Regions:
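C-terminal/domain-edge helix-coil "capping" segments
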Residues: 23-27, 49, 57, 61, ...
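Short beta-strand->alpha-helix linker/helix-N-cap micro-motif
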Residues: 24-90, 94, 98-113, 130-133, ...
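Structural signature of tandem alpha-helical TPR/SEL1-like repeats
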Residues: 192-200, 224-237, 258-271, 277, ...
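Residue-level recognition of tetratricopeptide repeat
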Residues: 211, 245, 278-279, 311, ...
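TPR alpha-solenoid repeat register
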Residues: 214, 248, 281-282, 314, ...
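Terminal, low-structured helical/coil segments at or just beyond the last alpha-helical repeat
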Residues: 342-395
Length: 395
């Protein structure tokens, strides 16, 4: 069966779907801190982050923290301040969101003793200009994790009223997290320096061995610094239920590739391809397979190229696989396509020369030989948006 990239599917869907069934976008705002203690601001960020991640894990499109923070900055809004309904609407419109989840919390009791939290939230439907009833909860502060799951369930049920998923199933799939670990993780997300972020994420991971989110952040932190073995050690601990799981698997595949573990890289990319069949995943899967001299590499490079024929990386890799198979004339056409898009590409020039001279490939271990090119960025949003659009059409 022929497979298509997310971008190809999205283009095709535009001809099938009307605006009424386009995927809906959701945003969760940081909850206002009514406790008059700025040391508790992290609670408002925690509610926002965890509800957003829970909804995302259920397949809903939820805008990320960076987008929301940028709008707050542009509108000169203070994080964790109580917003009027009019301001909430303006934030949602600035983010082009269909639904906004917002609310506030208060904490009672002495810091040195047992404290309780009261949480209240609503879902605002911007397309119909109506909002849900208020969801409110009161519990000991140490039960914050379970309160967040309860709120996420209410929001999910409001946004997906026809869901067949039960509340018990929804909650069982989410492990409780120690509140001190959660606090360190959230403080890490908002920390001003990279060193502080790393220290707080590491502390969160140490406090709760089953806490997946800081493990993803630590893996990404080390990947960005080319500490590939340490990155791989963290990334392989990210739980399958974590909304960052596929991004973690992508970075894990890249880390293993850089470490020369091509079988492990192939395993990671193949796992993602089964869920999110997008260009960059097929490309990197093909690269790992090419390093193992597997014939499937060419097929996956061609799948990536089908999704975006304007990308010189995909043309290069198709040419590389054909050259290794001794298909010099066809490979030369691929390298010419690369040079049509980037005339100053030295590797493509070298490989075209080898094809014209009919120079055969040497050992895969030859470091002087140009190898397949990787994609470093993974974006599943377009594919998930398409999936959401098609699900909406079924309803």
């Amino acid at each position: 069966m022929r497979r298509f990239s997310a971008s190809s599917f999205l283009l095709f869907a535009c001809f099938l779907l009307t605006p009424a069934v386009l995927a809906e976008t959701n945003v969760v705002l940081p909850f206002a801190n009514l406790a008059k203690d700025q040391a508790l601001d992290w609670v408002g960020e925690s509610i926002c982050e965890n509800v957003a991640e829970a909804l995302s894990a259920e397949g809903l499109l939820v805008l990320d923290r960076e987008d929301r923070c940028e709008v707050y900055r542009r509108m000169s809004l203070r994080q964790y301040a109580l917003l009027t309904r009019a301001t909430v609407i303006k934030v949602g419109e600035a983010l082009d969101a269909d639904h906004v989840i917002f609310g506030q919390f208060s904490v009672s009791g002495e810091p040195s003793g047992r404290r309780s939290i009261r949480l209240a939230a609503r879902v605002l439907d911007l397309t119909r200009l109506r909002q849900s009833i208020e969801f409110s909860y009161t519990a000991p502060l140490e039960d914050l994790a379970s309160l967040q799951v309860s709120l996420a369930w209410e929001a999910y049920r409001y946004l997906r009223p026809q869901t067949a998923r039960s509340e018990a199933e929804f909650k069982t799939s989410r492990q409780a997290t120690r509140i001190d670990a959660m606090e360190n993780y959230i403080r890490g997300l908002v920390a001003p320096t990279q060193e502080q972020r790393h220290r707080l994420f590491a502390q969160a991971a140490r406090l709760d061995p089953n806490y997946s989110q800081p493990r993803f952040q630590l893996g990404r932190w080390h990947w960005e610094r080319e500490n590939y073995q340490i990155a791989a050690d963290w990334l392989k601990q990210v739980a399958a239920s974590d909304p960052h799981y596929r991004a973690a698997a992508f970075l894990l595949g890249l880390s293993r590739y850089q470490l020369g573990d091509y079988a492990g890289a192939e395993e990671a990319f193949a796992g993602i391809a089964k869920q999110i069949p997008v260009n960059e995943v097929f490309n990197n899967l093909g690269a790992a397979q090419a390093r193992r001299d597997r014939p499937e590499a060419l097929e996956n490079f061609r799948r990536a190229l089908e999704g975006d024929e304007s990308d010189p990386v995909y043309h290069f890799n198709v040419g590389y696989a054909l050259w290794r198979q001794g298909e010099f004339d066809v490979a030369a056409d691929s390298f010419r396509a690369v040079l049509d898009r980037n005339s100053g590409d030295p590797e493509a020039t070298l490989m075209l020369g080898r094809c014209l001279k009919r120079t055969r490939a040497r050992s895969l271990d030859a470091r002087s030989e140009a190898g397949p090119r990787l994609k470093q960025e993974f974006n599943e949003t377009a594919y998930l948006q398409l999936k959401e659009m098609l699900e909406a059409k079924k309803q």
